[in-house]
Regions:
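Composition-driven recognition of long, low-complexity, acid-poor segments enriched in small hydrophobic
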Residues: 4, 8-23, 29, 45-48, ...
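Short, flexible domain-boundary/linker segments around small modular repeats
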Residues: 11-16, 85-86, 106-107
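G/A/S/T/P/Q/N-biased, glycine-rich low-complexity segments that form flexible N-terminal tails, linkers
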Residues: 20, 35-38, 151
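Acidic, low-complexity, intrinsically disordered interaction modules
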Residues: 29-34, 40-47, 61, 100-120
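Repeat-associated, polar segments at repeat-unit boundaries in modular proteins
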Residues: 42-74, 119-143
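Amphipathic, heptad-repeat alpha-helical segments
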Residues: 74-98
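Short acidic DE-rich linear segments
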Residues: 147-153
Length: 153
């Protein structure tokens, strides 16, 4: 679990660097994002990296003021990743209840629908939703592994 979080954090940092550089220089990030997707292909964070880099690619054309956008987007990212980190342990170690999932969804929604500048609103909504999807993806993956393990006992 700790490895997963560290890898996801590292991948987020790498994608964020490409995103930030592209926003401030206007360079096309498609190749750099594809290289990141290739780098993490076959790992536990493959889906997360694929989803996050696509969000970043689709957000770039919306950016009008890179400095303002990136400052707020960084704040969004930090808050979203805290929700992810705080709940990943529960996903990896326990059975999630409906109340747990509802709490996670509310935390992510609160971030996604906070009072962000209009330019950053879409990024906040999409990234906060993506974190919920990623937690669910990992939960489903681990639950299936558990089910498969019991078949051999």
């Amino acid at each position: 679990m700790d490895n997963y979080i560290k890898t996801a954090l590292r991948a987020t940092g790498e994608a964020w660097t490409v995103f930030k550089t592209s926003a401030s220089t206007g360079q096309n990030p498609k190749l750099a994002f594809q290289q990141l997707r290739d780098k993490y292909k076959g790992t536990d964070v493959e889906g997360y990296v694929t989803d996050y880099t696509k969000i970043c690619e689709e957000e770039l054309p919306r950016i009008k003021n890179a400095e303002t956008y990136m400052a707020q987007a960084k704040d969004v990212g930090n808050k979203v990743f805290q929700v992810f980190k705080a709940n990943a342990k529960k996903v990896f170690t326990e059975t999630m209840t409906d109340d747990d999932w509802n709490r996670i969804i509310k935390m992510a929604s609160d971030i996604g629908y906070s009072n962000w500048d209009s330019e950053v609103k879409e990024y906040a909504k999409r990234y906060s939703a993506q974190i919920v999807w990623e937690l669910d993806r990992q939960y489903q993956r681990l639950h299936k592994i558990k089910e498969d393990w019991w078949k051999f006992v």
